[in-house]
Swiss-Prot record:
Residues 1-61 form the MADS-box domain. It comes from the Eukaryota. Residues 175-184 have a biased composition (Basic and acidic residues). Keywords: DNA-binding, Nucleus, Transcription, Transcription regulation. This is MADS-box transcription factor 21. SUPFAM superfamilies: SRF-like. Expressed in developing seeds.
Length: 265
């Protein structure tokens, strides 16, 4: 079974790149040696590794002599330089043509994606385009739904945070209102309470202080009765007391002692 085709591009792995360089360098030197022997050609080969190390091969005295011969040939031959320039110009023209073709292909593909320039497409190409569009739309919808779900989840979390913050603020406001109401009620109670008596005193003094400011003692003032009226009142009171005392003694059954005898009156 033959060896598979290797894609020519830079080897990313450093170790693999170094191993490949050593193998292919030896192969290149071998090919140069064989070419010099088989064709009797003067060959000078110069190679610099990625680390800057120099490798050279020459089938003559030295590589420097071959380089000097090259310089002399370039200076004496006027047609050699234009040949190199023509080759370079042709190379860049080919590369530019490739780039233009790639740009045209990409532009056509973009037009096909929006439904333009599809008149010359075959049924197979249209079916392939349809499949690609469906896959693209499916991926776009999936990504859109993912973003929407993420946004909804974020908004729900934000809503919960705002509700918690609102409840906290309501509790703070209610607490402040209760404290203000309690302070106001305490102030009203202090205003309604009577002032204490200064230096102590009887209850009558406190009651007099509690009387309204409009109290007028002149309304309760009455002149003293004359002396004769006082004497008559005192005599009546004494007579009444004597009568009451005599009746009480009769009802209680007092014993009266007479000539050394006792008996119930």
């Amino acid at each position: 079974m033959g060896r598979g085709k290797i894609e020519i591009k830079r080897i990313e792995n450093k170790t693999s790149r170094q191993v490949t360089f050593c193998k292919r360098r030896n192969g290149l030197l071998k090919k140069a040696y064989e070419l010099a022997i088989l064709c009797d050609a003067e060959i000078a080969l110069i190679v610099f590794s990625s680390r800057g190390r120099l490798y050279e091969f020459s089938n003559v005295n030295s590589t420097r002599s071959t380089i000097e011969r090259y310089k002399k040939a370039s200076a004496s031959t006027s047609g050699s330089a234009p040949v190199i320039d023509v080759n370079s110009h042709q190379y860049f023209q080919q590369e530019a043509a490739k780039m233009r073709h790639q740009i045209q292909t990409l532009q056509n593909a973009n037009r096909h994606l929006i439904g333009e320039s599809i008149g010359n497409m075959t049924a197979k190409e249209l079916k392939s385009l349809e499949n690609r569009l469906e896959k693209g739309i499916s991926r776009i919808r999936s990504k859109k739904h993912e973003l929407l779900f993420s946004e909804i989840e974020y908004m729900q979390k934000r809503e919960a945070d705002l509700q918690n913050e609102n409840m906290f603020l309501r509790a703070k406001v209610a607490e402040a209102e209760r404290a203000e109401h309690d302070d106001q009620q305490a102030a009203e109670d202090d205003e309604m309470a009577p002032a204490p008596a200064v230096g102590g005193g009887s209850s009558s003094g406190t009651e007099l202080e509690a009387l309204p400011a409009t109290f007028d003692t002149r309304e309760y003032y009455q002149p003293a009765p004359p002396v004769s009226m006082l004497a008559a009142a005192a005599a009546a009171a004494a007579a009444q007391y004597s009568s009451d005392h005599h009746q009480t003694a009769l009802h209680l059954g007092y014993f009266k002692v007479d000539s050394g005898k006792g008996g119930l009156l």
